Amino acid sequence: MKIQLIAVGTKMPVWVKNGFEEYQRRFPKDMPFELIEIAAGKLGKNADIKRILEQEGKAMLAAAGKAKIVSLDIPGKPWTTEQLATQLESWKSDGRDICLLIGGPEGLSTECKQAAEQSWSLSPLTLPHPLVRVIVAESLYRAWSLTTNHPYHRE
C-alpha cells in the first residue's frame, strides 16, 4: 500500500518541508509515503473562490486516480492514535492505495468531499494547511509504529 498526501500549495516554509520529510523518510519501504503538491489558485480581492476550489479539487482528484480518498476536514471523524492505527491496518488489508486530501486556505471543494470514502478531523480547530502536512505525517508514522510495536509510540 502506498500513502499519498495530496495538498494544495507548492511554496511551503522550510520548517514545513523539513518536518514532513523527517517523518516521510521513517516510513518502511513496503509503505511508501509521498507528497503531491497541487498549485493553489490565485486569491485576490476579486477572486472567484468557488472556481478556484473547483480547479484545485479537479487537480487533486486527478492526482488521486483510483486510490481510496480520505479527506481532512473539520466535520470529519476524529481518531485517536489507536483508532488511526486500526484504520491503517484496515487500509492495508483493503489492498488499495490511500490518498489523503488537504485543502488550501479555502478548504476542500465539494467534489473532493463527495469523492472521499472517509473524512478525518484532526481537530475541531481550524489549522493552517501547511502545519497539517506535518501533523498528518507524524500521526501516520506514530500509528504505523503502534501497529509494528516500534518503540516510537509510548503510552
UniProtKB/Swiss-Prot annotation:
Signal peptide: none annotated. It comes from the Bacteria. Keywords: Cytoplasm, Methyltransferase, rRNA processing, S-adenosyl-L-methionine, Transferase. One of its GO terms (molecular function) is rRNA (pseudouridine-N3-)-methyltransferase activity. Coiled coil: none annotated. GO terms for cellular component: cytoplasm. It is found in: Cytoplasm. It catalyses: pseudouridine(1915) in 23S rRNA + S-adenosyl-L-methionine = N(3)-methylpseudouridine(1915) in 23S rRNA + S-adenosyl-L-homocysteine + H(+). Its EC number is 2.1.1.177. InterPro entries: Alpha/beta_knot_MTases, RlmH-like, tRNA_m1G_MTases_N. S-adenosyl-L-methionine binds at L72, G103, L122, S123, P124, L125, T126, L127. Belongs to the RNA methyltransferase RlmH family. NCBIfam families: PRK00103.1-1, PRK00103.1-4, tRNA_RlmH_YbeA. Homodimer. Specifically methylates the pseudouridine at position 1915 (m3Psi1915) in 23S rRNA. This is Ribosomal RNA large subunit methyltransferase H.
